[in-house]
C-alpha cells in the first residue's frame, strides 16, 4: 500500500501558516492532498460552563487533544478513514458533528503547536516553521478574530498582550528548532515555498 507523506506546518498565530499551506497544496496538483488543521482538535469542553470555557487558555498546548490527532494520523497512514472533530468557536467547545476524512497522498498538519509534541513530530516527514514579525501577526489576528469570530477589538488586544504573546514566547517560538526549514514572510516567500514543494514532491514519488 502506498504510504502517506505527512507535513507539519507551525508558527505563531497570524504568521501566515494558512497561506503557506494553500500555496503548497496548489503546487502539489496531481497528488491527493488534504489539510488536517490542529484547530479541529481543541479539547471537548462540554462539561464546563460557558463562563468557565471563556477562562480557558486556548494558546497553551494543553488546549489541544493531540492524542486524538495522533491516532487519526496513524489510521490515515494505515489506509483507514477517520472521523475528524469540528469545533464551535461561538460556544467554545467541540461540535457534535464530525467530518469523514479519507487517506491522501499528502496530509498537511497545520497549527501553532504542530511541532510542539514529540510523538506528533515523529510522524512528520517534513517539518516547517513559518516565521513572521510580531507586529504583523497581531494585525492579522485582530482582523481574523473580529471579522470571522465575532470578537471585539479590545478583547483581541487584551488576549494578545496577556495570553497570546507570553504563550508564543514560551511554547511556540522554541519549536522553531525542530523545523527542517524556517520560512520567513509566510505565504509571500515564493522561493522557500517552491523549494519545499520540490522536496515534498520527491518524497511523494518515493512512497
UniProtKB/Swiss-Prot annotation:
Keyword terms: ATP-binding, Cytoplasm, Kinase, Nucleotide-binding, Transferase
GO annotation terms (biological process): CTP salvage; UMP salvage
Gene3D superfamilies named in the record: P-loop containing nucleotide triphosphate hydrolases
Binding positions (ATP): 11-18
Enzyme class: transferase
Molecular functions (GO terms): ATP binding; cytidine kinase activity; uridine kinase activity
Pfam families attached to this UniProt entry: PRK
GO cellular component, one term: cytoplasm
Claim: Transferase is one of the keywords in the record: yes
Keyword ATP-binding annotated: yes
Localization annotation: Cytoplasm
Known pathway: Pyrimidine metabolism; CTP biosynthesis via salvage pathway; CTP from cytidine: step 1/3; Pyrimidine metabolism; UMP biosynthesis via salvage pathway; UMP from uridine: step 1/1
Entry-linked InterPro entries: P-loop_NTPase, PRK/URK, Uridine_kinase, Uridine_kinase-like
Catalytic activity, EC: 2.7.1.48
Chief site of localization: cytoplasm
Reaction it catalyzes: uridine + ATP = UMP + ADP + H(+); cytidine + ATP = CMP + ADP + H(+)
Protein family according to the UniProt entry: Belongs to the uridine kinase family.
Protein name per Swiss-Prot or TrEMBL: Uridine kinase
Gene: udk
